Amino acid sequence: TLFQVNGPVGLATWKDYCYDLSKSDVYKDVESDDYVLKDGDAVDGIAYVIETYGLIYNKALLNKYFELPDASIKSIDELNNFQALKTVAEEIQAHKDDLGVEGAFTSAGMDSSSDWRFKTHLANLPIYYEYKADGIDSTDAIKGTYLDNYKQIWDLYLNNSTCEPSMISSKTGDDAASEFSLGEAVFYQNGTWAYNDIKDNEVAEEDMGMLPIYIGVDGEENQGLCTGSENYWCVNKNASEEDIQATLDFMKWVVESDEGRDMLANQMGFVTPFTTFADYLPDNPLVKANAEYTEAGKTPVSWNFTTMPSENWKNNLGGALLNYAQGTGTWDSVQTAFVDGWAEEYAAANE
């Protein structure tokens, strides 16, 4: 009776089976409609876990950089836009021997265990800003308005990393996690879920922070971290009334009872979008970093990659990013995969 979809694209396949949750207790407990999937006034899905990603950073190493006599940026408060990030990354790279690191950024691995960080999560930024500028929340034809911004952050990763750009095809997600957790790199693009991969190593808990991914857009000083969900509860409307009610009761128990909340927050380590979880935050410094940005009034970047037209679109974009990095392709190919590929894949998926 209870099933899960990953967002608007997944919902399109299953929406005819979705029970309207608009009058449910669990919907009343949601912080905002940012965390629900709607079809008109009907609530088809409710996120039960929200996650956050950005640039995980090593506070101790960054402070070591700030203390360099010729460091242009002297505090984390100044590191609030792309130009500042570029300056810091390039100066860390120039002083990597002094700082005892292999590079400013961990390797941008493009094997299948890591490429999603760039073809999906990094690509979310230009999509987010285009949607925001155009006042939309999905499209059948992306324009690529912010592709120059995508290029400059990708270039920054490639040119200020623990490895040469030509080596990224064989670099893995484990490589990047290891480089960060051993103190070989200052910045690591990933999310709150990566905590378990990097804890209990060289980087102390109190030295783990997270920065927004700045790509050089006006006003990004007020940008927060990328926060959203790919995990939405849906209820099968074709089930018996008895089963539907039992499922609604179970969902209410999960988000309102002490036992249910303890299970989600502490045993599973989830951050949830429910008002009932104020006292149930997992013991994860990356989660706390996001809470600090929210409290400071920063605007979170929504997860718009859930509107990407297909896996094929992501894979073609990833291939173009890799070819560009290795010098076997041009940025024009990235643009083609991003813009033309979107229209083609959207049309194919919605025939």
Regions found by a protein language model. Give the residues of each.
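Extracytoplasmic/periplasmic solute-binding protein
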Residues: 40-48, 53, 83-139, 185
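Conserved N-terminal structural module of periplasmic/extracytoplasmic solute-binding proteins
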Residues: 1-10, 23-26, 217-220, 242, ...
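Short helix-initiation/N-cap motifs at beta->coil->alpha
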Residues: 79-84, 167-182
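Conserved C-terminal helix/tail region of periplasmic/extracytoplasmic solute-binding proteins
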Residues: 258-262, 272-281, 294-351
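Hinge/lid segment of periplasmic solute-binding proteins
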Residues: 3-63, 117, 207-213
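Short, solvent-exposed loop/beta-turn-alpha elements that line the ligand-binding surface or hinge
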Residues: 22-33, 74-80, 109, 127-152, ...
